[in-house]
């Protein structure tokens, strides 16, 4: 029997009030299972990123609850939620978000520095070996390719062994071949370490490889392509 890791109960999101109010996400339920790869797909402005941010603890819903390991993350205070994001959740963004003044190594290890934990050197070696950037750890982001920068961002998201990883258009700034290779490495790494992966993508070929496909149309959650 599969275990739930994330559950959204009647979540919705409305921006503004009165006549100017815009409903970005209509009341919906969603369940994500432990260890699965789920994709979120839909047209631009359909509500994909809004849903991802709500599920990841970055944007409170207007209504509803988000349960991570059975705990309502938006019932937590700011400090508790920040701790959950640092220890249980990993994020990968389209624009990499690497610090230019830091080495690749330090960029990857930022989750440990923020949480005052001792870096996991064994995990660092294993991840960077799988991702093919072990020889780039002393370089600055400007000294490596876009594909390598995104691999560093993937390593940063996974190295703290989060329960769940959210990726918002992780291949959006990469060419087709590099994007395919990067996505393959991301799914392989998440599977290797037993992490649940939720990816927002506009690419149906990437979406089709997921165990669960979540389609967003005009703020409504629809399962499947």
Task: Please name every model-derived segment.
Residues 4-215:
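ABC family nucleotide-binding domain
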Residues 213-225:
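H-loop (His-switch) and adjacent beta-strand-loop-beta switch element
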């Amino acid at each position: 029997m599969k275990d739930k890791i994330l559950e959204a109960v009647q979540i919705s999101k409305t921006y503004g009030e009165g006549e100017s109010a815009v409903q970005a996400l209509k009341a919906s339920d969603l369940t994500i299972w432990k260890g699965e790869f789920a994709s979120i797909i839909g047209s631009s402005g359909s509500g994909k990123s809004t849903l991802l941010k709500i599920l990841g603890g970055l944007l409170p819903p207007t209504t509803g609850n988000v349960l991570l390991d059975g705990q309502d993350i938006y019932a937590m205070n700011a400090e508790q939620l920040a701790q959950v994001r640092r220890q249980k959740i990993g994020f990968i963004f389209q624009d990499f978000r690497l610090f230019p003044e830091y080495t690749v190594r330090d960029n990857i290890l930022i989750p440990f520095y923020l949480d005052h934990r001792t870096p996991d050197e064994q995990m660092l070696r294993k991840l960077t070996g799988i991702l093919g950037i072990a020889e780039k750890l002393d370089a600055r982001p400007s000294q490596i390719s876009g594909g390598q920068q995104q691999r560093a961002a993937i390593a940063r998201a996974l190295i703290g062994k989060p329960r769940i990883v959210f990726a918002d258009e992780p291949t959006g700034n990469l060419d087709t071949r590099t994007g395919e290779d990067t996505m393959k490495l991301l799914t392989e790494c998440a599977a290797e370490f037993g992490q649940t992966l939720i990816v927002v993508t506009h690419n149906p070929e990437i979406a089709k490889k997921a165990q669960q496909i979540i389609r967003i149309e005009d703020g409504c959650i629809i399962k499947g392509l």
